[in-house]
Protein backbone atom coordinates (compact mmCIF):
# COMPACT_ATOMS: atom_id res chain seq x y z
CA UNK A 1 0.00 0.00 0.00
CA UNK A 2 1.23 3.45 -0.94
CA UNK A 3 -0.45 5.86 1.51
CA UNK A 4 -0.13 8.85 -0.81
CA UNK A 5 -1.71 7.02 -3.75
CA UNK A 6 -4.49 5.75 -1.49
CA UNK A 7 -5.18 9.24 -0.15
CA UNK A 8 -5.24 10.74 -3.64
CA UNK A 9 -7.65 8.06 -4.87
CA UNK A 10 -10.03 8.44 -1.94
CA UNK A 11 -10.04 12.25 -1.99
CA UNK A 12 -10.70 12.26 -5.75
CA UNK A 13 -13.64 9.91 -5.16
CA UNK A 14 -14.91 12.15 -2.34
CA UNK A 15 -14.71 15.22 -4.57
CA UNK A 16 -17.08 13.49 -6.96
CA UNK A 17 -19.23 11.34 -4.65
CA UNK A 18 -19.48 13.16 -1.30
CA UNK A 19 -22.83 12.71 0.41
CA UNK A 20 -25.12 15.73 0.45
CA UNK A 21 -25.77 16.15 4.18
CA UNK A 22 -27.73 18.92 5.87
CA UNK A 23 -24.80 19.96 8.04
CA UNK A 24 -22.02 19.61 5.50
CA UNK A 25 -20.20 22.07 3.29
CA UNK A 26 -19.17 19.77 0.45
CA UNK A 27 -15.92 19.77 -1.51
CA UNK A 28 -17.22 22.26 -4.08
CA UNK A 29 -18.30 24.66 -1.35
CA UNK A 30 -14.96 24.31 0.35
CA UNK A 31 -13.12 25.14 -2.85
CA UNK A 32 -15.35 28.21 -3.20
CA UNK A 33 -14.31 29.40 0.23
CA UNK A 34 -17.45 28.45 2.18
CA UNK A 35 -16.52 27.70 5.78
CA UNK A 36 -17.99 24.98 7.93
CA UNK A 37 -20.09 26.22 10.85
CA UNK A 38 -18.59 24.68 14.04
CA UNK A 39 -22.00 24.75 15.74
CA UNK A 40 -23.63 22.71 12.97
CA UNK A 41 -20.69 20.29 12.81
CA UNK A 42 -20.75 19.77 16.58
CA UNK A 43 -24.54 19.39 16.72
CA UNK A 44 -24.54 16.84 13.91
CA UNK A 45 -21.74 14.81 15.48
CA UNK A 46 -23.57 14.62 18.80
CA UNK A 47 -26.81 13.58 17.09
CA UNK A 48 -25.07 10.96 14.97
CA UNK A 49 -23.67 9.09 17.96
CA UNK A 50 -25.50 5.73 17.91
CA UNK A 51 -27.99 7.21 15.40
CA UNK A 52 -28.27 6.86 11.61
CA UNK A 53 -28.10 9.81 9.22
CA UNK A 54 -31.73 9.40 8.00
CA UNK A 55 -33.02 9.35 11.57
CA UNK A 56 -30.85 12.25 12.80
CA UNK A 57 -31.42 14.60 9.85
CA UNK A 58 -34.97 15.80 10.68
CA UNK A 59 -33.90 16.43 14.27
CA UNK A 60 -30.91 18.43 13.07
CA UNK A 61 -33.14 20.54 10.83
CA UNK A 62 -35.63 21.07 13.66
CA UNK A 63 -32.91 22.09 16.11
CA UNK A 64 -31.14 24.48 13.75
CA UNK A 65 -34.42 26.11 12.74
CA UNK A 66 -35.40 26.65 16.37
CA UNK A 67 -31.90 27.33 17.74
CA UNK A 68 -29.75 28.60 14.85
CA UNK A 69 -26.72 29.39 17.02
CA UNK A 70 -25.02 27.86 20.02
CA UNK A 71 -25.95 30.93 22.05
CA UNK A 72 -29.63 30.48 21.23
CA UNK A 73 -29.45 26.87 22.34
CA UNK A 74 -27.56 27.77 25.51
CA UNK A 75 -30.34 29.99 26.90
CA UNK A 76 -33.17 27.52 26.27
CA UNK A 77 -34.94 25.72 29.13
CA UNK A 78 -33.75 22.17 29.75
CA UNK A 79 -37.24 20.71 29.34
CA UNK A 80 -37.71 22.29 25.92
CA UNK A 81 -34.47 20.80 24.61
CA UNK A 82 -35.18 17.39 26.14
CA UNK A 83 -38.64 17.36 24.55
CA UNK A 84 -37.19 18.31 21.14
CA UNK A 85 -34.64 15.51 21.53
CA UNK A 86 -37.31 12.88 22.28
CA UNK A 87 -37.09 10.01 19.83
CA UNK A 88 -33.34 10.32 19.25
CA UNK A 89 -32.56 8.19 22.31
CA UNK A 90 -29.45 8.18 24.49
CA UNK A 91 -30.79 11.17 26.40
CA UNK A 92 -27.55 11.85 28.25
CA UNK A 93 -26.44 13.31 24.91
CA UNK A 94 -29.09 16.03 25.21
CA UNK A 95 -27.94 16.94 28.72
CA UNK A 96 -24.33 17.03 27.56
CA UNK A 97 -25.40 19.11 24.56
CA UNK A 98 -26.83 21.79 26.82
CA UNK A 99 -23.84 21.74 29.16
CA UNK A 100 -21.47 22.19 26.22
CA UNK A 101 -23.57 24.93 24.60
CA UNK A 102 -23.64 26.86 27.86
CA UNK A 103 -19.90 26.50 28.33
CA UNK A 104 -19.26 27.82 24.81
CA UNK A 105 -21.69 30.70 25.33
CA UNK A 106 -20.61 31.64 28.85
CA UNK A 107 -16.90 30.82 28.88
CA UNK A 108 -15.87 31.29 25.24
CA UNK A 109 -18.02 34.18 24.08
CA UNK A 110 -20.18 31.93 21.92
CA UNK A 111 -17.17 30.80 19.84
CA UNK A 112 -16.04 27.18 19.77
CA UNK A 113 -12.33 26.54 20.49
CA UNK A 114 -10.55 25.80 17.22
CA UNK A 115 -8.16 23.07 18.40
CA UNK A 116 -8.69 19.48 19.45
CA UNK A 117 -7.24 20.20 22.91
CA UNK A 118 -9.47 23.23 23.36
CA UNK A 119 -12.55 21.28 22.32
CA UNK A 120 -11.67 18.47 24.73
CA UNK A 121 -11.95 21.04 27.51
CA UNK A 122 -15.67 21.48 26.85
CA UNK A 123 -18.11 19.40 28.93
CA UNK A 124 -19.55 16.38 27.17
CA UNK A 125 -17.02 16.34 24.31
CA UNK A 126 -15.16 13.06 24.16
CA UNK A 127 -12.06 12.28 22.09
CA UNK A 128 -13.99 11.36 18.93
CA UNK A 129 -16.26 14.42 18.85
CA UNK A 130 -13.40 16.79 19.62
CA UNK A 131 -11.30 15.28 16.83
CA UNK A 132 -14.22 15.38 14.36
CA UNK A 133 -15.10 19.02 15.05
CA UNK A 134 -11.44 20.06 14.94
CA UNK A 135 -10.93 18.36 11.57
CA UNK A 136 -14.22 19.17 9.85
CA UNK A 137 -14.89 22.66 11.20
CA UNK A 138 -11.31 23.93 11.55
CA UNK A 139 -9.30 21.71 9.16
CA UNK A 140 -7.00 20.49 11.91
CA UNK A 141 -5.08 17.27 11.11
CA UNK A 142 -6.73 15.07 13.74
CA UNK A 143 -7.37 11.35 13.76
CA UNK A 144 -11.15 10.90 13.40
CA UNK A 145 -12.17 7.28 13.95
CA UNK A 146 -15.85 6.30 14.16
CA UNK A 147 -17.47 2.95 13.44
CA UNK A 148 -17.39 3.47 9.68
CA UNK A 149 -13.71 4.38 9.77
CA UNK A 150 -12.90 1.38 11.97
CA UNK A 151 -14.48 -0.89 9.38
CA UNK A 152 -12.60 0.74 6.48
CA UNK A 153 -9.26 0.58 8.28
CA UNK A 154 -9.77 -3.00 9.44
CA UNK A 155 -10.34 -4.03 5.83
CA UNK A 156 -7.61 -1.95 4.26
CA UNK A 157 -5.06 -3.54 6.62
CA UNK A 158 -6.86 -6.91 7.18
CA UNK A 159 -6.59 -6.53 10.93
CA UNK A 160 -7.09 -9.94 12.52
CA UNK A 161 -7.65 -8.81 16.11
CA UNK A 162 -11.39 -8.73 16.87
CA UNK A 163 -13.33 -5.72 18.05
CA UNK A 164 -13.35 -4.20 20.59
CA UNK A 165 -9.78 -5.31 21.36
CA UNK A 166 -8.63 -4.06 17.93
CA UNK A 167 -9.67 -0.44 18.56
CA UNK A 168 -6.21 0.85 19.62
CA UNK A 169 -4.56 -0.80 16.60
CA UNK A 170 -7.20 0.56 14.23
CA UNK A 171 -6.72 4.05 15.63
CA UNK A 172 -2.95 3.75 15.24
CA UNK A 173 -3.27 2.59 11.63
CA UNK A 174 -5.74 5.37 10.82
CA UNK A 175 -3.26 7.90 12.19
CA UNK A 176 -0.68 6.80 9.60
CA UNK A 177 -2.97 8.15 6.86
CA UNK A 178 -3.62 11.61 8.37
CA UNK A 179 -1.86 14.54 6.69
CA UNK A 180 -1.90 18.32 6.90
CA UNK A 181 -3.51 18.42 3.45
CA UNK A 182 -7.34 18.51 3.53
CA UNK A 183 -7.77 16.85 6.93
CA UNK A 184 -11.48 17.70 7.15
CA UNK A 185 -12.19 16.26 3.71
CA UNK A 186 -10.08 13.22 4.53
CA UNK A 187 -12.08 12.48 7.68
CA UNK A 188 -15.36 12.84 5.82
CA UNK A 189 -14.12 10.80 2.85
CA UNK A 190 -13.35 7.87 5.14
CA UNK A 191 -16.77 8.20 6.78
CA UNK A 192 -18.54 8.33 3.42
CA UNK A 193 -16.61 5.35 2.10
CA UNK A 194 -17.68 3.30 5.11
CA UNK A 195 -21.29 4.47 4.90
CA UNK A 196 -21.86 3.99 1.16
CA UNK A 197 -19.30 1.50 -0.21
CA UNK A 198 -17.48 -0.38 2.56
CA UNK A 199 -20.73 -1.53 4.17
CA UNK A 200 -20.83 -4.00 7.06
CA UNK A 201 -22.48 -6.98 5.34
CA UNK A 202 -22.36 -6.36 1.60
CA UNK A 203 -19.35 -4.20 0.69
CA UNK A 204 -19.49 -2.83 -2.85
CA UNK A 205 -15.88 -3.66 -3.61
CA UNK A 206 -16.33 -3.29 -7.37
CA UNK A 207 -17.11 0.40 -6.81
CA UNK A 208 -14.45 1.09 -4.18
CA UNK A 209 -11.84 3.71 -5.13
CA UNK A 210 -9.19 2.05 -2.95
CA UNK A 211 -9.96 -1.61 -3.72
CA UNK A 212 -6.48 -2.08 -5.15
CA UNK A 213 -5.03 -1.31 -1.72
CA UNK A 214 -7.48 -3.42 0.33
CA UNK A 215 -5.82 -6.35 2.09
CA UNK A 216 -9.18 -7.79 3.18
CA UNK A 217 -10.40 -7.89 -0.42
CA UNK A 218 -7.25 -9.78 -1.32
CA UNK A 219 -8.28 -12.52 1.14
CA UNK A 220 -11.52 -13.03 -0.81
CA UNK A 221 -13.70 -12.42 2.25
CA UNK A 222 -13.74 -8.68 3.01
CA UNK A 223 -17.17 -8.92 4.64
CA UNK A 224 -15.62 -10.93 7.50
CA UNK A 225 -13.71 -7.83 8.63
CA UNK A 226 -13.62 -6.37 11.16
CA UNK A 227 -13.38 -9.55 13.18
CA UNK A 228 -15.77 -9.61 16.12
CA UNK A 229 -16.03 -11.50 19.35
CA UNK A 230 -19.29 -13.31 20.08
CA UNK A 231 -21.90 -10.99 21.56
CA UNK A 232 -23.00 -11.59 25.13
CA UNK A 233 -26.69 -12.27 25.66
CA UNK A 234 -28.43 -8.98 26.43
CA UNK A 235 -30.22 -9.09 29.79
CA UNK A 236 -34.00 -8.76 29.97
CA UNK A 237 -35.82 -6.55 32.43
CA UNK A 238 -39.49 -6.18 33.23
CA UNK A 239 -41.66 -3.37 34.52
CA UNK A 240 -45.17 -1.95 34.57
CA UNK A 241 -46.30 1.23 32.82
CA UNK A 242 -49.45 2.91 34.08
CA UNK A 243 -51.63 4.70 31.54
CA UNK A 244 -54.00 6.84 33.60
CA UNK A 245 -56.41 9.07 31.69
CA UNK A 246 -58.82 11.81 32.69
CA UNK A 247 -61.02 12.69 29.76
CA UNK A 248 -58.72 13.71 26.94
CA UNK A 249 -55.67 13.97 29.22
CA UNK A 250 -53.04 11.44 30.29
CA UNK A 251 -50.98 11.37 33.48
CA UNK A 252 -47.22 11.84 33.11
CA UNK A 253 -44.35 12.19 35.56
CA UNK A 254 -40.88 13.67 35.24
CA UNK A 255 -38.11 11.14 35.77
CA UNK A 256 -35.25 11.88 38.19
CA UNK A 257 -32.55 14.12 36.66
CA UNK A 258 -29.88 11.42 36.77
CA UNK A 259 -30.02 7.94 35.33
CA UNK A 260 -31.66 6.43 32.27
CA UNK A 261 -33.99 8.91 30.53
CA UNK A 262 -33.14 11.41 33.27
CA UNK A 263 -35.26 14.55 33.39
CA UNK A 264 -37.66 13.34 30.69
CA UNK A 265 -41.44 13.29 30.88
CA UNK A 266 -42.66 9.69 31.07
CA UNK A 267 -45.52 7.42 31.99
CA UNK A 268 -45.57 6.42 35.65
CA UNK A 269 -43.84 3.05 36.01
CA UNK A 270 -42.83 0.47 38.55
CA UNK A 271 -39.19 -0.35 39.15
CA UNK A 272 -37.56 -2.37 36.37
CA UNK A 273 -36.29 -5.75 37.50
CA UNK A 274 -35.16 -9.17 36.32
CA UNK A 275 -38.53 -10.93 36.54
CA UNK A 276 -42.07 -10.14 35.32
CA UNK A 277 -44.87 -8.71 37.45
CA UNK A 278 -48.09 -10.56 38.18
CA UNK A 279 -51.34 -8.64 37.73
CA UNK A 280 -52.00 -8.23 41.45
CA UNK A 281 -48.45 -7.09 42.16
CA UNK A 282 -48.59 -4.67 39.24
CA UNK A 283 -51.79 -3.07 40.53
CA UNK A 284 -50.30 -2.71 44.02
CA UNK A 285 -47.60 -0.38 42.65
CA UNK A 286 -50.04 1.81 40.70
CA UNK A 287 -49.87 5.60 41.17
CA UNK A 288 -53.59 5.90 42.02
CA UNK A 289 -56.54 3.86 43.25
CA UNK A 290 -58.50 3.02 40.11
CA UNK A 291 -59.98 0.13 38.15
CA UNK A 292 -56.73 -0.88 36.44
CA UNK A 293 -57.02 -3.19 33.44
CA UNK A 294 -54.20 -5.20 31.90
CA UNK A 295 -54.26 -4.12 28.24
CA UNK A 296 -51.10 -5.69 26.84
CA UNK A 297 -47.33 -5.46 26.79
CA UNK A 298 -44.64 -3.67 24.79
CA UNK A 299 -40.98 -4.53 24.34
CA UNK A 300 -38.21 -1.98 23.83
CA UNK A 301 -34.51 -2.42 23.26
CA UNK A 302 -32.04 -0.21 25.10
CA UNK A 303 -28.30 -0.35 24.50
CA UNK A 304 -27.53 -2.78 27.29
CA UNK A 305 -30.83 -4.53 27.99
CA UNK A 306 -34.28 -5.34 26.64
CA UNK A 307 -37.31 -4.08 28.55
CA UNK A 308 -40.81 -5.57 28.59
CA UNK A 309 -43.48 -3.30 30.06
CA UNK A 310 -46.80 -4.69 31.23
CA UNK A 311 -49.45 -2.07 30.42
CA UNK A 312 -52.18 -1.18 32.88
CA UNK A 313 -54.82 1.34 31.95
CA UNK A 314 -57.43 3.17 34.02
CA UNK A 315 -59.56 6.30 34.10
CA UNK A 316 -59.33 8.48 37.19
CA UNK A 317 -57.51 11.14 39.17
CA UNK A 318 -54.09 11.16 40.82
CA UNK A 319 -51.86 13.50 42.77
CA UNK A 320 -48.28 14.38 41.91
CA UNK A 321 -48.66 13.85 38.17
CA UNK A 322 -48.54 16.13 35.13
CA UNK A 323 -51.69 16.06 33.01
CA UNK A 324 -50.95 16.28 29.31
CA UNK A 325 -53.29 16.20 26.28
CA UNK A 326 -53.42 12.72 24.77
CA UNK A 327 -52.62 14.16 21.36
CA UNK A 328 -49.48 15.90 22.61
CA UNK A 329 -47.25 12.93 23.40
CA UNK A 330 -44.59 13.20 20.69
CA UNK A 331 -42.12 14.63 23.21
CA UNK A 332 -42.07 11.38 25.18
CA UNK A 333 -39.09 9.01 24.91
CA UNK A 334 -39.73 6.25 22.39
CA UNK A 335 -40.37 3.54 24.98
CA UNK A 336 -43.14 5.55 26.65
CA UNK A 337 -44.63 6.81 23.40
CA UNK A 338 -44.82 3.19 22.25
CA UNK A 339 -46.43 2.14 25.53
CA UNK A 340 -48.98 4.99 25.53
CA UNK A 341 -50.02 4.33 21.95
CA UNK A 342 -50.38 0.61 22.57
CA UNK A 343 -52.45 1.14 25.71
CA UNK A 344 -54.67 3.73 24.08
CA UNK A 345 -55.05 1.54 21.00
CA UNK A 346 -53.55 4.33 18.83
CA UNK A 347 -56.59 6.54 19.50
CA UNK A 348 -54.74 9.57 20.77
Describe these PLM feature segments.
Residues 2, 8-9, 13-223, 236:
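Catalytic cores of DNA base-excision repair glycosylases
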Residues 1-26, 192-348:
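Intrinsically disordered, low-complexity, charged terminal extensions of DNA damage-control enzymes
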